[in-house]
């Protein structure tokens, strides 16, 4: 039985390692109430070692920037400006020959929204971003 448990633990750790390569970012969300109609949506992204996420403020004609948009067909709320980003770094891209803005290890991104319908019970957004190590996904 002990050998089976050891094998199962080893097999589980191999599965987790494989999952890490396919999903190098984990995003948690929280909400901060500002007023009766305004809220901050806080995205806390944890990136696996060696991976980075591009900022929404990347220069034109460079890597794909982060985008937060309302899902098509959704209503009752709107985005207020661009999201606020914390803990970004500048990184020179040999490919684009430009300095780009990225997150390493952790990203905290805060998007303010305004309710246009106070009875709304769910907020659904697209969080589109490019994560890279030696290749991008």
Set out the residue ranges of the language-model regions.
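Bacterial Sec-dependent N-terminal signal peptides
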Residues: 1-23
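Extracellular/lumen-exposed scaffold segments
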Residues: 18-137
